[in-house]
């Protein structure tokens, strides 16, 4: 049996969460956009890259919302153009990401795999603003109370890529989910389960 955390979180954040067994796990990160195998560091099994110009346009729209911050994800590092200092500490120490600060989003030094709106007042408030503008370009999902994530992958496509990389049939996969970003994964897995504490 192979255990694989599937999350909107970054690879390094997941490794910290699962520290006692981190080297034994496979990882589906950034809502399916980045896949890592076991060991330390794990082998990169796949990544799904966003078109840069459109991703940066989305990042600018998020920055234009006064109560939101934009977090741009590469494979191993998240990038932030912070409006407030406390968001840096939150992402670095509470979320546990490897984090770099950018002067502007155009300074993003690597491929973009995910763009996230961090909205402490609630992602459901900004989803109706951003979602319809980008739904024909990127997948988007509410990923926890404060996060609205955009990328070209989702946990379902990530699971399919992971199954191919590991030579596992989707019907042999058991998946557990509790939020909207889990729906594509639950649809792709042979044995899906919704947690009791799932979002309504």
Question: Where would I find each of the regions flagged by the language model?
Answer:
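Generic anion/oxyanion-binding catalytic loop in active/binding sites
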Residues: 3, 44-47, 148, 175, ...
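Short, structured coil segments at secondary-structure junctions
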Residues: 20-23, 31, 133-136, 188-189
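Short, well-ordered beta-strand core segments
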Residues: 27, 192-194
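Conserved acidic, metal-coordinating active-site core of Asp-based
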Residues: 61, 67-176, 180-188, 197
């Amino acid at each position: 049996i192979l255990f694989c955390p599937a999350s909107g979180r970054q690879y390094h954040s997941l490794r910290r969460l699962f520290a006692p067994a981190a080297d034994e796990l496979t990882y589906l990160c950034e809502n399916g956009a980045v896949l890592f195998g076991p060991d330390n560091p794990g082998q990169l099994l796949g990544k799904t890259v966003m078109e840069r110009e459109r991703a940066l346009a989305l990042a600018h729209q998020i920055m234009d919302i006064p109560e939101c911050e934009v977090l741009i994800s590469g494979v191993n590092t998240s990038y932030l153009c912070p409006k407030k200092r406390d968001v840096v500490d939150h992402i670095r120490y509470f979320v546990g990401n490897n984090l770099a600060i950018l002067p502007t989003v155009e300074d993003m030094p690597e491929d973009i795999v995910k763009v996230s709106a961090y909205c402490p007042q609630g992602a459901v408030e900004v989803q109706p603003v951003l979602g319809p503008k980008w739904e024909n370009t990127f997948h988007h999902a509410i990923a926890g109370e404060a996060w609205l994530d955009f990328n070209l992958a989702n946990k379902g496509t990530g699971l399919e890529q992971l199954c191919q990389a590991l030579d596992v049939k989707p019907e042999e996969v058991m998946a557990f989910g509790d939020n909207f970003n889990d729906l594509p994964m639950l649809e792709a897995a042979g044995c899906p389960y919704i947690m009791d504490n799932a979002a309504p």
